Amino acid sequence: MTGAPLRDSLYLPSECEIITVTDLTPGEKLFRIRRADGLPLGHLPGQFVQVSLLGWGEAPISVASSPTRDGFFELGVRRAGTFTSAMHTLKAGDTLGIRGPFGRAFDLPRLRGQNLILISGGCGLAPMRSLIQYCEDRPAEFGSISILYGAKSPVDRLFKEELAAWDASARFACSMTVDNISGRDCFSGSVGLITALIPPLTFSPDTTIAAIVGPPAMYRAVIAELHKKGLPSDRIAVSLERQMRCGVGKCGHCSIEHLYCCQDGPVFWLNEIELLRGAL
């Protein structure tokens, strides 16, 4: 399940223009981008693109917006190294190269008609936002939707205004937690690990699917809690984080035994990868 690549050649980036740049946290920015030719990116929730900057190289970044939002796509970028630091210097009107979209998306046909538990940790909310927006724009296609989000601290939360809107919406049941809080923070949510948000949930495993996006250290603990609630591995989707260089399964940097994260993933059903060495 993939969108259409920007160009006939998978290796040639297409020119795109930055529309706006928004600060999400002190270390993360949201880039709203459009193709120079005006066409849609053609992605699906869960896919990624390869972003290139002349003189700086290329990096894989998940798409943070839904394909239902026309005229642009968005990328959430954490400043973590040389390339992303260079991206953080860009402003509206600047151009960059985009290859993609690449990878296996969330299985929308299978998600339709199901109750969803969408679990994100840290900057994992950026790719999950693509799926949340899709559900928001097509509410009749899904059952109940629970959004669980955990961050290091209140200031590290992404999309604060959207989190508040989702929390206030009758369409979503939204629960948030942070690992730590100081006396200066104004935060009314829970304090603790994201795993504490799962036991209070009430759902039928036969009609529920969970999706998880976050730091690798989070996955095993979250999966264990979902299993305790009776949710089987074939009803848990995970988006795996790997260093994807080529994006088309040629370089092997993102391999997990016989699978390539850039092509067979990044979204997998848990039963497909839970027994593979190094997957989780």
What is each residue range found by the language model?
Residues 4, 82-245:
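FNR/FR-type flavoprotein reductase catalytic core
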Residues 2-94, 152-153, 179-180:
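Ferredoxin-reductase
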Residues 257, 268, 272-280:
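Short Fe-S-cluster ligation motifs
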Residues 241-266:
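Local cysteine-cluster metal-coordination motifs and their immediate loop/turn environment
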